[in-house]
UniProtKB/Swiss-Prot annotation:
Residues 28-48 bind DNA. PANTHER family: LEXA REPRESSOR, LEXA REPRESSOR-RELATED. GO terms for biological process: DNA repair; DNA replication; negative regulation of DNA-templated transcription; proteolysis; SOS response. SUPFAM superfamilies: LexA/Signal peptidase, Winged helix' DNA-binding domain. The keyword DNA repair applies. It catalyses: Hydrolysis of Ala-|-Gly bond in repressor LexA. GO terms for molecular function: DNA binding; serine-type endopeptidase activity. Belongs to the peptidase S24 family. Homodimer. Gene3D superfamilies: Umud Fragment, subunit A (2.10.109.10), Winged helix-like DNA-binding domain superfamily/Winged helix DNA-binding domain (1.10.10.10). This is LexA repressor. Keywords: Autocatalytic cleavage, DNA damage, DNA repair, DNA replication, DNA-binding, Hydrolase, Repressor, SOS response, Transcription, Transcription regulation. The gene is lexA.
């Protein structure tokens, strides 16, 4: 299989997650919505490129006609990528961010983990998340008040507790030495990259 672009890696991870959780692949519109494309046509172009590279197979004319070659006979994945420092503006699962893999079943976590993020700093120590820990992350774009999220703010990735009231969001540390980050969504870009679903201490 030819090497995928970082965006295509994200699409493939989303397709796999839909297959695991729902039993069927996503539509082009669902991919576009999940990845923030302006239209399903953009998703279609990525899918065609991925098919040419051998990452997926497509059934013409079928809205969910996406198949991962060999997926019916492959065993469940037993490892997760470990993501280190994330470069500004780059997708979290871009190849250059992956340090190594950890031999653990993604299904050990609920919902399933998509990757492990190496924690930097002690801003979440009061909930048992310490510098150097591996945070198991389930990729999603929505969060509810009180959840611990991986968020991207001004191209920096951070782990904090999420709270929202209208157009105001607070990213709250679990350490009294750190002040909450207050974000006005009308003025700043905030992206939820995923939810914390567990911690591995190393």
């Amino acid at each position: 299989m030819h090497k995928l672009t970082p965006r295509q890696v994200e699409i493939l991870a989303f397709i796999k997650r839909c297959l695991e959780e729902n039993g069927y692949p996503p539509t082009r519109a669902e991919i576009a919505r999940e990845l923030g494309f302006k239209s399903p046509n953009a998703a279609e172009e990525h899918l065609k490129a991925m098919a040419r590279k051998g990452a997926i197979e497509m059934t013409p004319g079928a809205s969910r006609g996406i198949r991962i070659p060999g997926s019916e006979v492959e065993s469940e994945p037993t490892s997760l990528p470990i993501v280190g420092r994330v470069a500004a503006g780059a997708p979290i699962l871009a190849q250059q961010h992956i340090e190594e893999t950890c031999q653990i079943d993604p299904g050990f976590f609920h919902p399933r983990a998509d990757y492990l993020l190496r924690v930097r700093g002690m801003s979440m120590k009061d909930v048992g998340i310490y510098d150097g820990d591996l945070l198991a992350v389930h990729t999603c774009r929505e969060a509810h008040n009180g959840q611990i999220v991986v968020a991207r703010l001004n191209d920096e990735v951070t782990v904090k507790r999420f709270r929202r009231d209208g157009d105001k969001v607070w990213l709250i540390a679990e350490n009294p030495e750190f002040s909450p980050l207050e974000i006005d969504l009308t003025e700043q870009d905030l992206t939820i990259e995923g939810l914390s679903v567990g911690v591995i201490r190393r």
